């Protein structure tokens, strides 16, 4: 099994961190946690409301608190928000307390998957493709830098991506335990 205390899913919005993460957590008998859901619970309001009335800095502060709390436990699969990796301390903490899986997706697939999403604050723009392209350019190198494993989820259903990730994780952990 995973030699790290937790399994951490990173990647852009629409990559499948939550939907695939729930399935992976169930398969490996891990407690599932979603940082965005935990932020909403802690703040008592929606992410859109936090962005609108308190701004992105306050949202990122809450995100950091929630992430630290979740990482202080073990045997969790933590699905992070797409921007969690922007904070250098978050990146350090995720690497220290988890096996980090980057669910990679291209901008066109993101657009398809998020076409009807009207709740994400960063997508409340006229040119969604440009917003996603800009986010991709900024965040992609950070995702890759801290990832222990990269899985591309383009053109994969959640079930297919889950099955592939289970195979990849199992093979990686078996290989790691054989070389330890």
Curated annotation (Swiss-Prot):
Q: How does the cofactor bind to this protein, according to its record?
A: Binds 1 Mg(2+) ion per subunit.
Name the cofactor(s) required for activity, per the record.
Answer: Mg(2+)
The alphabetized UniProt keywords are: Amino-acid biosynthesis, Aromatic amino acid biosynthesis, ATP-binding, Cytoplasm, Kinase, Magnesium, Metal-binding, Nucleotide-binding, Transferase
Q: Which reaction does it catalyse?
A: shikimate + ATP = 3-phosphoshikimate + ADP + H(+)
Where is substrate bound in this sequence? 36, 60, 82, 139
Localisation? Cytoplasm
Question: According to the UniProt entry, what is the EC number of this protein?
Answer: 2.7.1.71
Q: Which PROSITE patterns match?
A: SHIKIMATE_KINASE (PS01128)
Sites where the protein binds ATP: 14-19, 120
Molecular function GO labels: ATP binding; magnesium ion binding; shikimate kinase activity
Which sequence ranges form a coiled-coil region, renumbered to this chain?
Answer: none
The cross-references to CDD domains, in alphabetical order and at most eight, read: SK
Positions bound to Mg(2+): 18
Show the GO cellular component annotation of the record.
cytosol
Say yes or no: keyword Amino-acid biosynthesis present. Answer: yes
Q: What does the entry give for GO biological process?
A: amino acid biosynthetic process; aromatic amino acid family biosynthetic process; chorismate biosynthetic process
Q: Which InterPro entries match?
A: P-loop_NTPase, Shikimate/glucono_kinase, Shikimate_kinase/TSH1, Shikimate_kinase_CS
Main localisation, per the record? cytoplasm
Ranges annotated as spanning the membrane:
none
Q: Which HAMAP family match?
A: Shikimate_kinase
Role, per record: Catalyzes the specific phosphorylation of the 3-hydroxyl group of shikimic acid using ATP as a cosubstrate.
Q: Which PANTHER family match?
A: SHIKIMATE KINASE, SHIKIMATE KINASE 1, CHLOROPLASTIC
Subunit structure, per the record?
Monomer.
Q: Which family does it belong to?
A: Belongs to the shikimate kinase family.
Question: What protein name is recorded for this chain?
Answer: Shikimate kinase
Q: Which gene encodes it?
A: aroK
């Amino acid at each position: 099994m995973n030699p790290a205390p937790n399994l951490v899913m990173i990647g852009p919005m629409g990559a499948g961190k939550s939907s695939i993460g729930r399935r992976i957590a169930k398969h490996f008998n891990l407690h599932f946690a979603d940082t965005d859901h935990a932020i909403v619970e802690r703040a008592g309001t929606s992410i859109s409301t936090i962005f609108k009335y308190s701004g992105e800095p306050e949202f990122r502060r809450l995100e950091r608190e929630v992430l630290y709390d979740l990482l202080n436990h073990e045997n969790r699969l933590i699905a992070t928000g797409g921007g969690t990796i922007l904070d250098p301390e978050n990146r350090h903490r995720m690497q220290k307390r988890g096996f980090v899986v980057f669910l990679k997706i291209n901008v066109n697939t993101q657009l398809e998957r998020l076409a009807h999403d009207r709740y994400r604050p960063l997508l409340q723009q006229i040119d969604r493709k440009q917003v996603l392209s800009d986010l991709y350019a900024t965040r992609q190198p950070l995702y890759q830098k801290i990832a222990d494993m990269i899985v591309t989820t383009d053109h994969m259903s959640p079930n297919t991506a889950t099955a592939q990730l289970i195979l990849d994780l199992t093979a990686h952990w078996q290989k790691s335990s054989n070389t330890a």
